[in-house]
Amino acid sequence: TLNGTPIHVSDKPLDQGLFIMGTAIYLREFVKPTMSLTEQLLERSCDYRRFGAATLDLCYIACGRAEVFFEYSLAPWDYAAGAFIAQEAGAIASTLTGEPLPWIRRCSVWLANPANQHVLGELTV
């Protein structure tokens, strides 16, 4: 809940909504793939946001404030709580290769409302 009101992901398609991205800038090998994926998502969305704290980003998806989140490399302490909250609110979580989140190791993270889970399969990751 948020201030006593149950939260839920939005039902907006990405072309009417936002995506949130993380940069993993400390891992230089992910700079170009991150920018490529950002460009692909910008072509399919209204805009994007970059807040800098993955758990906050994932909770924004849970509350319906944005439709999709991705980052190429997050440690479990960066994504586990937020991904769990978002899944409880109706989000679908996976790695960028479509695998289930491992919960115990570093991985890429894709989180989307059900209306946008298909977008992952349309992207060059």
Describe each PLM feature range:
Residues T1-L58, R106-V125:
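Acidic beta-strand-loop-alpha-helix segment within the catalytic core
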Residues S36-L42, L56-V125:
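Oxyanion/phosphate-interacting regions
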